[in-house]
């Protein structure tokens, strides 16, 4: 039987450097879409990912949709 809520959900990760500098001359905001397991990671997800706008690895945090 299927449960009411799915365990794995899709989340969006956004670059923290690009989000903070959005008012300045930034070309855009880097975003990644990934999945997380609700049981194993109930808190917000934070990962180091490559940002093409910052040209380096930065912290990407989970955002609300």
Swiss-Prot record:
InterPro entries given in the database record: Ribosomal_bL33, Ribosomal_bL33_CS, Ribosomal_bL33_sf, Ribosomal_zn-bd
UniProt-listed PROSITE patterns: RIBOSOMAL_L33
Chloroplast is among the record's keywords: yes
Molecular-function GO terms, alphabetical: structural constituent of ribosome
Top-level taxon of origin: Eukaryota
GO BP term, example: translation
GO cellular component terms attached to this protein's record: chloroplast; ribonucleoprotein complex; ribosome
Keywords, alphabetical: Chloroplast, Plastid, Ribonucleoprotein, Ribosomal protein
HAMAP family listed in its UniProt record: Ribosomal_bL33
Descriptive protein name: Large ribosomal subunit protein bL33c
Organism this protein belongs to: Zygnema circumcarinatum
């Amino acid at each position: 039987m299927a449960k009411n809520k799915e365990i794995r959900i899709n989340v969006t990760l956004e670059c923290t450097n690009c989000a903070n500098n959005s008012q300045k001359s930034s070309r855009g905001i880097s975003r990644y879409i990934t999945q997380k397991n609700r049981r194993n990671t109930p808190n917000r997800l934070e990962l180091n990912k490559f940002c093409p706008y910052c040209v380096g690895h930065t912290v990407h945090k989970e955002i609300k949709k």
